[in-house]
């Protein structure tokens, strides 16, 4: 099937300075997957990122963490699609979203960047908005629009608080389940579960 999931990309910024920040929750999801499933990432310079493989046969996935910094993520994703011979429809991008409460997920088969520089770069390099993305809620820094704008950078580049960590753990588990469901069921059926995902703490 042409639209079978083949490549999962977690967006984030490389380096210890950004480890554990809200903007890096895409990286965090793939790192947790690697830890649980017992595989590791390796540097692949031609793809400008860290790459891993998981599964066999029809369930085999390539996983990518671009090392280009968020604003140039699309360069790494374009290189990976070309190298492996995949189409944008066979891609899933894991991306943080400030417009979604922490603990919630939103799956979309296509769409605009929504103000996210990593998605903007991906759209530019792929030449299309038609690729699946899993938006992972990180919550907003404030309800007031002016205060929210003023605190956006410090919020996304800040770390999750100790109080938020239990919800982070739950949503990362949800991301891994979401990937498995997309593999088994496809985007539409999996989306029903993913878009309804809501830990009790955020209901």
UniProtKB/Swiss-Prot annotation:
| Compartments reported by the entry | Cytoplasm
Q: Where is the active site?
A: 23
Q: Which InterPro entries match?
A: Pept_tRNA_hydro (IPR001328), Pept_tRNA_hydro_CS (IPR018171), Pept_tRNA_hydro_sf (IPR036416)
**Species this chain originates from:** Parasynechococcus marenigrum (strain WH8102)
Q: Key word Phosphoprotein present in the record? A: no
Q: List the disulfide bonds.
A: none
Query: What does this protein do, in the record's words?
Result: Hydrolyzes ribosome-free peptidyl-tRNAs (with 1 or more amino acids incorporated), which drop off the ribosome during protein synthesis, or as a result of ribosome stalling. Catalyzes the release of premature peptidyl moieties from peptidyl-tRNA molecules trapped in stalled 50S ribosomal subunits, and thus maintains levels of free tRNAs and 50S ribosomes.
Q: How does it assemble?
A: Monomer.
Q: Which Gene3D superfamilies match?
A: Peptidyl-tRNA hydrolase (3.40.50.1470)
Which chain positions carry the site (Stabilizes the basic form of H active site to accept a proton)? 96
Q: In this UniProt entry, which residues are annotated as the site Discriminates between blocked and unblocked aminoacyl-tRNA?
A: 13
- Residues holding tRNA: 18, 69, 71, 117
Upper classification of the organism: Bacteria, Bacillati, Cyanobacteriota, Cyanophyceae, Synechococcales
Q: What class of enzyme is it?
A: hydrolase
A Gene Ontology molecular-function term? Answer: tRNA binding
Query: Do you know which Pfam families this protein is assigned to?
Result: Pept_tRNA_hydro
**Keyword Hydrolase tagged:** yes
UniProt-listed GO biological process terms:
protein quality control for misfolded or incompletely synthesized proteins; rescue of stalled ribosome
Source domain of life is Bacteria
Q: Name one GO cellular component term.
A: cytoplasm
Q: What is its EC number?
A: 3.1.1.29
Q: Which family does it belong to?
A: Belongs to the PTH family.
Which keywords annotate this record?
Answer: Cytoplasm, Hydrolase, RNA-binding, tRNA-binding
- Name of the protein: Peptidyl-tRNA hydrolase
Its UniProt entry gives the catalysed reaction(s) as: an N-acyl-L-alpha-aminoacyl-tRNA + H2O = an N-acyl-L-amino acid + a tRNA + H(+)
């Amino acid at each position: 099937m042409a639209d079978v999931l083949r490549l999962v990309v977690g967006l984030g910024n490389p380096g210890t300075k950004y480890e554990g920040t809200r903007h890096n929750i895409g990286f965090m999801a793939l790192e947790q997957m690697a830890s649980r499933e017992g595989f590791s990432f390796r540097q692949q310079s031609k793809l400008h990122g860290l790459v891993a493989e998981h599964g066999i046969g029809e369930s085999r996935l390539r996983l990518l963490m671009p090392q280009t910094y968020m604003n140039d993520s699309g360069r790494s994703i374009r290189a990976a699609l070309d190298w492996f011979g995949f189409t944008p429809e066979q891609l899933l991008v894991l991306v943080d979203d400030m417009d979604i409460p922490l603990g919630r997920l939103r799956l979309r088969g296509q769409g605009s960047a929504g103000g996210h520089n990593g998605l903007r770069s991906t759209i530019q390099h792929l030449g299309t908005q038609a690729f699946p993305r899993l938006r992972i809620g990180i919550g907003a820094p404030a309800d007031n629009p002016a205060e929210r704008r003023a605190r956006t950078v410090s919020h996304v580049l800040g770390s999750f608080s100790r109080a938020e960590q239990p919800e982070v753990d739950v949503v990362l588990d949800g991301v891994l389940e979401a990937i498995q469901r997309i593999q088994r069921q496809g985007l539409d059926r999996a989306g029903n579960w993913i878009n309804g995902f809501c830990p009790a703490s955020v209901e």
